[in-house]
């Protein structure tokens, strides 16, 4: 099995090295990752300049682009052999609920949706590396077992690992996405020359985080695994829209 590994924290981030170490004994792994932190890049592509891959001393490929750029190039000519699946992470920080709309980690996995295997996005719910071994364990476990998984084509599996030692993790729960409240207002700053600027604030707290959600599972000490689909159509709105359109002249 051949796996393309990507992330959004950057090619030198500890999480991607940990993911490679977790999977390399069981698969032929190649790493293509941004040359700098691209957190929050979502599914953006770089269209205003050329992309230049550079192979590092450890064999990883660094790219001056986004997480989606990395996977896009990997699946469309940069690699001599097409991977069987894409695995993204390990992100240092949660990708729960609405986070998946902004996450470069999740976006990298989404770009791998055309391959025969499901794509995985792994996140550790911490900015610290203490419990990376826990996330490594579950990445290894889930990816190794993926061939026994019967899911529709183009399924993306979003996995969040609680910030706990392995022995304290209670298990794995199948979850739906929760929802966050609105984020706090951007933080206004003024530079020494008097020019105003803004820092984007932290994401909002969980607003829909009850039982069955990814938020709840992680808070209770479980690994959450949420299947994502690419159909963003809001089917429940069809009735009201159909009636509304019928009344237009």
From Swiss-Prot:
The keyword Metal-binding applies. It is found in: Cytoplasm. It comes from the Bacteria. GO terms for molecular function: 3'-nucleotidase activity; 5'-nucleotidase activity; exopolyphosphatase activity; metal ion binding; nucleotide binding. GO terms for cellular component: cytoplasm. Binds 1 divalent metal cation per subunit. Its main location: cytoplasm. It catalyses: a ribonucleoside 5'-phosphate + H2O = a ribonucleoside + phosphate. Its cofactor is a divalent metal cation. A divalent metal cation binds at residues 8-9, 39, 91. Keywords: Cytoplasm, Hydrolase, Metal-binding, Nucleotide-binding. Gene3D superfamilies: Survival protein SurE-like phosphatase/nucleotidase. Its EC number is 3.1.3.5. NCBIfam families: PRK00346.1-3, PRK00346.1-4, surE. Nucleotidase that shows phosphatase activity on nucleoside 5'-monophosphates. Belongs to the SurE nucleotidase family. This is 5'-nucleotidase SurE.
């Amino acid at each position: 099995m051949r796996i393309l590994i990507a992330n959004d924290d950057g090619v030198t981030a500890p999480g991607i090295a940990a993911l490679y170490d977790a999977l390399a004994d069981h698969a032929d792994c190649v790493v293509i990752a941004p040359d700098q932190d691209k957190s929050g890049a979502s599914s953006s592509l770089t269209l205003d300049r050329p992309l230049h891959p550079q192979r590092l001393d450890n064999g990883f490929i660094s790219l001056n682009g986004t997480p989606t750029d990395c996977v896009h190039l990997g699946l469309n000519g940069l690699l001599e052999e097409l991977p069987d699946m894409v695995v993204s992470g390990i992100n240092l920080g949660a990708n729960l609920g609405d986070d998946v709309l902004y996450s470069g980690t999740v976006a990298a996995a989404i770009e791998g949706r055309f391959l025969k295997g499901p794509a995985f996005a792994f996140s550790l719910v911490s900015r610290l590396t203490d419990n990376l071994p826990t996330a490594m364990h579950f990445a290894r476990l889930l990816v190794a077992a993926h061939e026994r998984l019967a899911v529709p084509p183009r399924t993306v599996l979003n996995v969040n690992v609680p910030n706990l030692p392995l022995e304290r993790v209670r298990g794995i729960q199948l979850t739906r996405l929760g929802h966050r409240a609105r984020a706090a207002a951007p933080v206004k700053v003024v530079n020494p020359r008097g020019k105003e600027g803004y820092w984007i604030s932290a994401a909002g707290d969980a607003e829909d985080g009850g039982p069955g959600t990814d938020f709840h599972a992680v808070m209770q000490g479980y690994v959450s695994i949420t299947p994502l689909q690419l159909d963003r159509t809001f089917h429940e709105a069809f009735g009201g829209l159909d009636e509304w359109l019928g009344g237009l002249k």
